[in-house]
A protein has these predicted regions:
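Short alpha-helical oligomerization interface
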Residues: 90-103
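Conserved NAD(P)H cofactor-binding loop of Rossmann-fold oxidoreductase domains
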Residues: 83-89
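Rossmann-fold cofactor-recognition segment
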Residues: 47-62
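Residue(s) in the substrate-gating loop at a strand-loop-helix junction
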Residues: 133
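Active-site helix of classical SDR
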Residues: 113, 149
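C-terminal helical subdomain
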Residues: 175, 187-226
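Conserved glycine-rich cofactor-binding loop
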Residues: 12-13
Length: 240
């Protein structure tokens, strides 16, 4: 098996962290990022030979400098996964929450996705993935900015997938739309069809390996996605 150089943006907890662990278990080199230096250092101590890290917040400046630094440390890049995100409920439509959501899930995401896509196009190979959400399908009264931001991510990645195909480059673009995963962000125990984080991470890795354009995690969430997409507004407004 060829060892790959992988960067996971947002890998100190949840799906991102589990993906890093699974990739390491497969013998790959992994670059991780996050806002908390102590958590990054803990992972580095656990896997001193396999892990490199950069500590930064995607809402701040110099995102690309940190990504470039990780590429240098890994001596290359084959796969980049954008897992960083925020999903706080904004029941009272709090602008501070919505602003943070947009800065993280739209601005920070787009800057990294844009730069990485162009990087892969120039080297004529690479796999780019994002952890979006089933929430991308429709609006939600409890977290309007979150669902809107996830819709942006999914639509942006659809555009990148089309662009890569037209450019005839060996670049794959994978959008993952998970349902409820048992992480702190989802507070998964309260919901149905809750997926263990290890299962979710494993399915995502397989989707990236197979160069899938879009996948739902777990797979049966495609049913919910279709129902939501075609659900009349007068029904939707009573549910979410």
């Amino acid at each position: 098996m060829v060892q790959k150089k992988i960067i996971i943006v947002g890998a100190t907890s949840g799906i991102g962290k589990k993906m890093a662990e699974l990739y390491i278990g497969k013998g790959h080199m992994v670059g991780i990022t996050g806002r908390r230096l102590d958590l990054l250092q803990q992972i580095k101590q656990q896997f001193p030979q396999e892990v490199e890290y950069e500590c930064f917040d995607v809402t701040e400046k110099e995102n690309i400098r940190h990504i470039q630094s990780l590429i240098d440390k890994l001596n290359g890049l084959d796969i980049l996964v954008i897992s960083a995100g925020t999903g706080e409920v904004s029941k009272e439509l709090d602008w501070k929450i919505d602003k943070r959501t947009i800065e993280t899930n739209v601005n920070g995401f787009a800057e990294i996705a844009n730069w990485t896509f162009n990087f892969f196009i120039k080297q004529d190979q690479g796999r780019l993935a994002v952890i979006s959400s089933i929430g991308a399908v429709r609006g939600n009264s409890w977290a309007p900015a979150y669902n809107a931001a996830k819709a942006f991510q999914s639509t942006y990645f659809e555009g990148l997938a089309i662009k890569a195909r037209r450019l005839k480059k060996n670049v794959s673009v994978t959008c993952i739309e998970p349902g409820f995963v048992n992480t702190k962000m989802a507070k998964g125990n309260k919901f149905f069809w809750v997926v263990p984080v290890e299962k979710a991470a494993g399915q995502i890795i397989k989707a990236i390996e197979k160069k899938k354009r879009k996948v739902y995690v777990s797979r049966r969430w495609w049913i919910i996605a279709k129902l939501l997409k075609w659900m009349p507004y007068f029904i939707l407004k009573r549910l979410i």
